[in-house]
Amino acid sequence: VIDWINAELNKSGNASSLYQKLEHPDYGNLVNHEKLFSGEIKTKPFSPARLWRTSPNVFDNIKSNYGGDARSIRQPFLVEDRKGIKEYANLLFADSAVVDVLLVNAGYCADQLIQKGQIYKDIASQKSAPTRDQLEVAASQHFKKVVFRDPTKEELKNYIALFTGSAKEGIHSEALRVMLMAIMMHPESVYRIEIGLGESDTSGRRMLSSTELAFAISYAITDRHPDSILLKAAESGKLRTKDEVHAQISRMLEDESIEKPRILRFFQEFFGYNQAHIVFKDEARSGGFSYYGENYPVIYERDADFFVLNILEKDKDVFKQMLTSDEYFILNRQTFRNTVFDFYEQNKELIDKGQLTEEKSKELLKRLGLKNWKELNKKYYLHGFDRGFNGSPEVIKKIGKEIPTEGRIDNRNKDKSYQVISQGMHTLYQKYPMAYDLKDGEQNFLLPQPYKRPNRAGMLTHPAWLIAHSLNDISDPIRRGKWIRQRLLAGVVLDVPITVDATIPEDHHKTLRERLSVTEAKACWRCHEQMNPLGYSFEIFDDFGRFRTIETLDKLPMVNGKFHSKPVDSRGVLAGTGEKNIDGDVKDALELIHKMANSDKVRQSIIRHVFRYYMGRNEMLSDSITLIAADKAYLESGGSFNALLISLLTSDSFLYRKTLTKE
């Protein structure tokens, strides 16, 4: 039937819009989930031949190679800050706006190189025509820094011809500038070339060449160009088989010195918790959501990062732990100060004498979860007066716990020595733990962490996720339910018709769930049935992420100093997993989450999103073999994300390209 529909659409000429929709991030779930994982599809997987625009993160890491002050080089490769996976290859182009910025950057860098680079200064200033050797060295040197490979003979010939043609007026500096700018505008400095320059097979697929693979692997795992080991493997012909690719990916994943920010970024984009800071919260309701530039939702996002990283470090049952773990990190600025003070209390005699053994210094680093002191500022987002802390006895003595009860206090004595203040929590931080259901002074944020928290289960009950998926002054059952339906249950929710008024009716005497009963009308329920029963279960949390059993009706006048309230109704329904022992009624979000964590469909749905992130596109039915193998690798490894990643990055979907024709 599907094949017949496709044939009829092709005949009518309306197929192109459908194909375009299937390629968009919002419509990946239109590809049938059951068919993808049934095993009935035997087509050899591949990705379409493509150019994938350079990532803004990669550009930030390599722009220092271009010449000039990296701070003056503008970011050309902006990506829409949308929820979900952002970088799809087919949606990113070097349009006129991108090219304009690239040209400005190229001109600036060329000018800087001519002013400061001796080889370029010599060519620009000499009266006689530069030799071919001079031009080849100049072009090759800049080319390698920009494109990360040696230019071919043909490329060198073209650049020298460009210089020669531009130098007819005898102005060598301008001709050199044109040549250097042309190098910076090389397609490989703008796009990742993934057209399949390797060997072809009988099905019309072409394997990525060794060079294409080196860049594809590096940009899949890191935000940097290939390291010397990967480039050497490509140049020596040792990146042509799956086993050779497997060896390089395993090496990079196991090497702790190689930063792998893209792994964390997947979970940020998948869960969307890194959007918490853009949801406005009224200060009168929150009691203050920032202090000295410290935006609490931003700190919650950082806490969530550590929640993710802790699970990834263990690399066991990763998806289940992401959904169910009750171990949370609470890492605001006081975490650092309080832990250092606690360390001081335990080692006071030694520190007061200015003595601290290497063993004790390592103990403090370990408690703070640091490899060295250089990591400190980045990890704990410190106040200016804490930056530069180096673990010496002198600076440890200057750390005191602050417990002002009224306003601020000066915790220094007249001789400017620091007074150590006894146990307690800075009152200005008492608003921060409210989202973790902590009472004032309940605990002091000491490290090491994590802390177990009651009434919580994984990322979907983390304050960062709950705030990110809320509205300005209310929770958001509809969008929370839609997120679960699409991200975890591979479901499709239709767009809101333009004729529908989606405004929630105001009634200050009703709870939000009661007000949303209008969506249960027959005309609305067809779509809302996919979302509301899932989202309602999260009504045990308010829009700040605080656990609750009653909903405060704070728009009504107070009575005897208190707002009216009603009990929370968090009953919901899980439907759509296709698993009889999992689908059914749930009393709240905690029961819902634990049920979903045991679902095959939920696990497979997450794997589909991992695929989209690393392949830069939606899956096709022809990717069935890849997805089934990835699911198998994940299960057989005990839930290892690294094993899943290796399976995907050594799959035919990653290694092979094919030119698609939409007939």
Q: PLM features: what roles do these ranges have?
A:
Residues V1-E663:
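Low-complexity, glycine/serine/threonine/alanine-rich intrinsically disordered linker
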